[in-house]
Swiss-Prot record:
Annotated residues for binding of Zn(2+) 2: D103, E138, H352
Domain of life of the organism encoding this protein: Bacteria
Entry's EC annotation: 3.5.1.18
Name the UniProt record assigns to this protein: Succinyl-diaminopimelate desuccinylase
CDD domains: M20_DapE_proteobac
Reported cofactor(s): Zn(2+); Co(2+)
Organism of origin: Burkholderia ambifaria (strain MC40-6)
SUPFAM superfamilies referenced in this protein's UniProt entry, alphabetically: Bacterial exopeptidase dimerisation domain, Zn-dependent exopeptidases
Key word Nuclease present: no
NCBIfam families linked to this entry: dapE_proteo (TIGR01246), PRK13009.1 (NF009557)
Alphabetized InterPro entries for the sequence: ArgE/DapE_CS (IPR001261), Bact_exopeptidase_dim_dom (IPR036264), DapE_proteobac (IPR005941), Peptidase_M20 (IPR002933), Peptidase_M20_dimer (IPR011650), Peptidase_M20A (IPR050072)
Reaction(s) catalysed by this chain's protein: N-succinyl-(2S,6S)-2,6-diaminopimelate + H2O = (2S,6S)-2,6-diaminopimelate + succinate
GO biological process entries: diaminopimelate biosynthetic process; L-arginine biosynthetic process; lysine biosynthetic process via diaminopimelate
Enzyme active site: D72, E137
Amino acid sequence: MSATLALTEQLIARASVTPDDQHCQQIMTERLAALGFECETIASHGVTNLWAVKRGADGRDGKLLAFAGHTDVVPTGPLEQWTSPPFVPAHRDGKLYGRGAADMKTSLAAFVVASEEFVAAHPGHRGAIAFLITSDEEGPATDGTVKVVELLEARGERVDYCIVGEPTSTAELGDVVKNGRRGSMSGELVVKGVQGHIAYPHLAKNPIHLLAPALAELAAEQWDAGNEYFPPTTWQVSNLHAGTGATNVIPGHADLMFNFRFSTASTVEGLQARVHAILDKHGLEYTLKWSVSGLPFLTPRGDLSNALENAIRAETGLTTELSTTGGTSDGRFIARICPQVIEFGPPNGSIHKIDEHIDVRFVDPLKNVYRRVLEQLIA
């Protein structure tokens, strides 16, 4: 069994359901400390975070390449639906099964072993290697990566490149990497009406009827046309509720929850202003609470994307696709302190599902791609 596969199994065996790290980071810290990494645990409200760094010959003047990832996994769901226990690594038909196999314990193991091999081959490496690991990526993400980033900002720590080990591949390892993500902003809208008996509508004010024209306009609005890197911004309703459940009561208010996934072609302030303008145009009496969970970020072609594309081509023969599709990731926080952030990991077809797994044939090639990137950028 390869070193990468063995470490992957060791991590899968820890039932690290968010935000419980279950000592996964301790396992990683022991390996990294043996390489000369300075390891710092940063705890916050039950969340465990790790910042580990190994300086190179150039000291703080050298380029720093960070690997960002998470040890937490999503809940298993009904255990009886799993073919084998989710936290007992199992091999079937060339695949390794277990919660976190794809998202993202294989990536964690691969970069640890890649770092071990790189340091052994390049003991005098010039640049620095760092790990930014959290147990709060699958949960609220309020005490994880963002807290470490705030600490690094306060210290004036510079991060030149960051690989986030999210499972970005689709059919084959390396066919897709993410060089950016859309922003995410949600709204909670309450439209006020006047409750009353449904037989006496002249004595009431139906908030559903009031909201409907504005809702139709919001749904039909083209917020932007996207750009070279991002598709157009989308607006979607996630929840709509009004009434008591009775058939003879006009409700006193209608509640709507919605979400924007927005590109760099739009801004938070611009989108909010346009929503308010539409609601005001329809004369609604309302309250609207906004929450922004992430801003869009984009890494244009540069040293990191070139190194990753070269490494993937050398290891797999594939020409990778740079993409910004999908949901948010912790890359949105890291982009605040790092100009080049790219996500790359194994295929994502089974993530968050019963019987999550990874094809074993991708495990060591993933490690090799990571090692090749280290060699190109900081050797």
